[in-house]
Every structure is written in C-alpha cells, then in structure tokens.
From Swiss-Prot:
The gene is tsaD. The keyword Membrane does not apply. Its EC number is 2.3.1.234. Binds 1 Fe(2+) ion per subunit. One of its GO terms (biological process) is tRNA threonylcarbamoyladenosine modification. Keywords: Acyltransferase, Cytoplasm, Iron, Metal-binding, Transferase, tRNA processing. This is tRNA N6-adenosine threonylcarbamoyltransferase. Substrate binds at L153, L154, S155, G156, G157, D186, G199, N298. One of its GO terms (molecular function) is N(6)-L-threonylcarbamoyladenine synthase activity. It is found in: Cytoplasm. Required for the formation of a threonylcarbamoyl group on adenosine at position 37 (t(6)A37) in tRNAs that read codons beginning with adenine. Is involved in the transfer of the threonylcarbamoyl moiety of threonylcarbamoyl-AMP (TC-AMP) to the N6 group of A37, together with TsaE and TsaB. TsaD likely plays a direct catalytic role in this reaction.
Length: 370
C-alpha cells in the first residue's frame, strides 16, 4: 500500500534494528508506515546442529552480520543516516548478548547522525505489528479506533494475554505457568524427530494427519482466568511416543500425533481467548482480538482464534506470517509510535533481558499520553 507524503501521520523515516534472539534484521519505514526496505537473516544454519539457539553464537552472528545489513537496508531505502527521524532498536526482553549488539549499534548510529535513539520493547513491537498500515489504513490506526484490544502474544519465549488500552498502556491478564506455546511445539517436534525448530515442520506434518485420532488433554481449558499450561500436554505426547521404542515412528502415526497435538493447542487457545475477552469486559471491552508472535503464523491456531473472536462479534487481526516471526519492520513501526509521543531513550539506556510490557517505564510521557 503506497501512501502519499501528505498522509504521513508519524515523524519519519525510522530505522529499526532487531537482534533479540536468532534473527538479525533491519528495516526502514517512512512516516506513513510504508516499508521502504527490510532484510531478515535467519541464523538457522548457525544453531541447527545444536538443536536450539546458543546465546554466544547468536551474539557473535549479530555482530558479524548487522553492520553490513544496516548499510544495505539504508542503500535500498535511498537514505542517509542524517535523513532519518530516529533510530529504534530492540532493547529487551531477549538474549542479552544479542540485545547489546543491536542496541549498541543503534546508539552509535544515533550519536553519529545526531538523531534520537528509541529503545524498543520486543513485546510492544509484536503487539503493534498487526496494526501496520497495509492491514488497516493508517488514518484509522492512528485515530485510536482499534483500542482497546486483546493481544494474544504467542511465541517460543512468550505466551500471554494482554489488554492493550493504547500505546504504552498494557495490562497483563494471564500467561503460561510453565512452557511457552512455541517452546511446546518445538519440544513435540523434537519428539517426532523433526529437528529444530520443530514448530513449522510439525504444522506441515499435521496436514497429513487426523486431528481427532488421539485424545490429548486440553490443559487449563474451562479454568477461571486465562492462564496457560503446556507441560502436561507435552508429557502426554512423550508418553504416547514412548510406545514406539524400537525405531522411528511410522509416518502415519507421527502425522496423527502432530495433528492431534496441534488441535489440542488450538482448542486451548480458543478457550483462553474467550476467557480473556470476558475478563477484558470487566475493565475495557476489547474491540478486536490481535494475535502476534511466531506461533501466530500457524494456520490452525489462527483459524481457531478467528472463530473465537467471531463468536464474540469482534474481528481477529494478525500480521502476515512473515511479520509474525521476529523482524525489524515491527521494531521501526513501534519506533514511529514512540517518536510521535516523544518517548525517546537516553544513550545510557541499558538493554534488559527481562522487560514486561506492564513495566512502569513502558508508559508514555504524561504530557503526550493519548
């Protein structure tokens, strides 16, 4: 979607940098939210042989790839650093080594170009990603008509229900009491011999299976509140797989396990979304359900949550799959919002491996709160 300059409702352009885990990414967005350039580099080959992300390797890879990537993305956008309105970098939560690399480069560029630096909360970037102009229209988004909404943040490291009352205004309603949903997908994928990361491979395998073949448990379904638990479901899958001790699972059995596990997760997600929406009714009724994070790319889960939202008479909105996983577009987009309200950061801002969305420092300056 191409917006003329007159429709720029944010100061821009903004460079976004993402290095919180194992994707190295950079992107530039203009003041309308239009993507001028973006690059995402997966570190899959660096970590696959270890069966998961190795923090030290991830940090070294960010250090090797990021400077050249930022230069390339600026060239693609046709901009100099002095043309930017600000530089935004993920500064938490995440793996501290990677955060230090990305935030450090962002601060250095901001200092050299004499531009503001904006420390971005990775969770806020996911929260706002579904509101990109290409999905709704920038005038409608910036008018605040979408707030409040219920965010279901579903990824390898996070599984939370959050009431989003505005930029910088987040109320956590519930979350996982053990594994994150993406972590559960990866662990079950490993049980099925699918390698790492297991989530996408499990989803593909599930297409060949019967989702009703196995009656796996639905942890927390029907419980008061909107918390999650996946350890019991993961254990149930492990116990079933243990019935095949003499070699690899037959493809048909593996596919049925994958499909039945995925169906159980989708069922739980729909139930927890319904419960969270009911909780929001007591505070500020949600106008829509937003689903974000890497697991939001899963078609079965998207469908289940869309149905749950439809039953409540509201829409479900999710980024396109490529923007569900970690990327710098969402970082730059969050940076545009924070810059609009003057919520810039000092160069002494320290990256935080843990940084909840409802932390006091997430609030916008009082004089600019919408």
């Amino acid at each position: 979607m191409d917006f003329p300059a007159s429709e720029n409702l944010f100061p821009g352009p903004v460079l976004g940098i993402e290095t919180s885990c194992d994707e190295t990414a950079a992107a530039v967005l203009d003041g309308s939210g239009r993507i001028l350039a973006e690059i995402v580099l997966s570190q899959y080959d660096d970590h696959a042989r270890f069966g998961g992300v190795v923090p030290e390797i991830a940090a070294r890879a960010h250090l090797a790839y990021l400077p050249g990537m930022v230069t390339e993305v600026m060239d693609k956008a046709g901009l100099r650093f002095q043309d930017l309105a600000a530089i935004a970098a993920t500064s938490g939560p995440g793996l501290i080594g990677g955060l230090l690399v990305g935030a450090g480069l962002g601060k250095g560029l901001a200092l050299a170009a004499k531009r503001p630096f904006i420390a971005i909360n990775h969770l806020e970037a996911h929260a706002l990603a579904a509101l990109l102009p290409a999905l709704g229209g920038v005038a409608e988004i910036t008018s605040g008509e979408h707030f409040p909404f219920l965010l279901m943040l579903l990824s390898g490291g996070h599984c939370q229900c959050i009431l989003v009352e505005g930029v910088g205004r987040y109320r956590r309603l519930g979350g996982t009491i053990d594994d994150a949903v993406g972590e559960a997908f990866d662990k079950v994928g490993k049980l099925l011999g699918l390698g790492w990361p297991g989530g996408p491979a499990l989803e593909r395998l599930a297409l060949q299976g019967n989702p009703h073949a196995l009656a796996f448990p639905r942890p927390m379904k029907g419980r008061v509140g909107c918390d999650f638990s996946f350890s019991g479901l993961k254990t149930a899958v492990a116990q079933y797989v243990a019935r095949f001790p003499d070699g690899p699972l037959p493809l048909s059995d593996a596919a049925d396990i994958a499909a039945s596990f995925q169906a159980a997760v989708a069922d739980v997600m729909a139930d927890r979304a319904t419960a969270a929406l009911a909780m929001a009714d007591e505070i500020a009724p949600a106008k829509m359900l937003v689903v974000s994070g890497g697991v939001a790319a899963n078609a079965a889960i998207r469908a289940a949550l869309s149905t749950a939202a439809e039953h409540r008479g509201i829409a479900m909105l999710a980024p396109p799959p490529r923007l569900c996983t970690d990327n710098a577009v969402m970082v730059a987009w969050a940076g545009l919002h924070r810059l609009k309200y003057g919520a810039v950061s000092g160069l002494d801002h320290a990256p935080l491996p843990r940084w909840p969305l409802d932390a006091p420092d997430m609030a916008l300056p009082e004089s600019t709160t919408p």
